[in-house]
Structure formats: C-alpha cells, structure tokens
C-alpha cells in the first residue's frame, strides 16, 4: 500500500515537473518578446523624442510588464543619481538584481547586459545601430525557439511522465 502511494507521488511529481519545464520554455519566449518591446520603446524615446537615456527608460517602464517595469525604473533612478558608476555596470547590476526570477537564461541576460554597454556613451547613430543589431539577434532567437516549442513541449511533458 505504501509503495503504491509512493509510486503515485513520484509519477505525479515528475509529471508536474515536465509541465512546469514546458511552461517555463514558453514563458522564456514571452519574456524575450518583452525585451524586444523594451528596446523598441527605448529606441523610439531616444530617436524620435530626443529623450535622455534615464528619461527614455522611465517612460518605457510604464508600458512594459512586471518585472521589466521595475528594472527600467530602478535603472533610470540609478542613472539619474549618477554615483560615478558606468552605465553599463549599473545596467548589468540591475539585470542581476531585478531579473533574477525570470525565465530568461544566463545567456539571455548576458546578451541583454552587452546591449546595455552600447547605451549611454555612444552617439545617437551608434545607439540606433546597436539597437537594430540587438533587435535582429532577439528576432532570430525568438524564431528559433518558436520552431522548437512543439518538440520541446512534447519532450518535457513526455519526460515528466
């Protein structure tokens, strides 16, 4: 009796683990799309409204989902305070602190941090080119992952059972 109950618990837990892993994969794609949206919003603020970077971040924060809104607000606040820290370091620190509970992989966060290195110190034209490049990279990654979804979802759910 106890063995049957234990076996049922193990099967249930492994099934739920597979479903959870599948959901996390889908959530990662959604969050990469949100990063894409963030870059487009910042690009619009900088190129068309001629906003300073902290202002562009703050303005974009109101238009994005949690936890990216707080990431942008915190980054803008710290950039405004300008305590002698380079913007790229500040950006990377906020990624580590504000985006640690997301479905984004370490690689996704590192690429986003590299994008942050191109903000703030380059002229507007170079920032525009850096944003275009990062958007293209994101687009390619999202396309690849969307093609992988059916296979990965099936794999995770099968492994769970």
What are these regions (language model features)?
Residues 1-10, 99, 105:
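Acidic, low-complexity proline/glycine-rich segments
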Residues 6-78:
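Juxtamembrane/interface alpha-helical elements of multi-pass membrane proteins
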Residues 28, 81, 124, 128:
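Conserved phosphate/pyrophosphate-binding and hydrolysis machinery centered on Walker-type P-loop NTPases
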Residues 30, 103-107, 130:
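A generic short alpha-helical patch detector that favors 3-5-residue windows
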Residues 35-38, 42, 75, 94, ...:
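Amphipathic alpha-helices that form helix-helix packing interfaces
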Residues 50-122:
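Glycine- and small-hydrophobic-enriched helix-loop-helix hairpins
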Residues 118-161:
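Membrane-interface, cytosolic juxtamembrane amphipathic helix immediately N-terminal to a transmembrane helix
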């Amino acid at each position: 009796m106890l063995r049957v109950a234990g076996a049922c618990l193990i099967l249930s837990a492994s099934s739920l683990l597979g479903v959870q892993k599948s959901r996390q994969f889908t959530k990662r794609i959604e969050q990469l799309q949100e990063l894409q949206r963030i870059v487009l919003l910042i690009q619009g603020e900088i190129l068309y409204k001629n906003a300073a970077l902290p202002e562009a971040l703050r303005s974009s924060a109101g238009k994005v989902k949690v936890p990216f809104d707080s990431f942008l607000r915190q980054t803008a606040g710290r950039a405004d305070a300008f305590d002698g820290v380079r913007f790229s370091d500040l950006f990377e620190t906020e990624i580590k602190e504000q985006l640690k509970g997301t479905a984004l992989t370490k690689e996704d966060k590192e690429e986003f941090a590299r994008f942050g290195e191109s903000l703030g110190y380059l002229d507007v034209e170079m920032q525009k080119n850096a944003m275009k490049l990062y958007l293209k990279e994101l687009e390619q990654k999202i396309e690849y992952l969307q093609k992988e979804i059916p296979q990965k979802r099936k794999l995770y759910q099968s492994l769970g059972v």
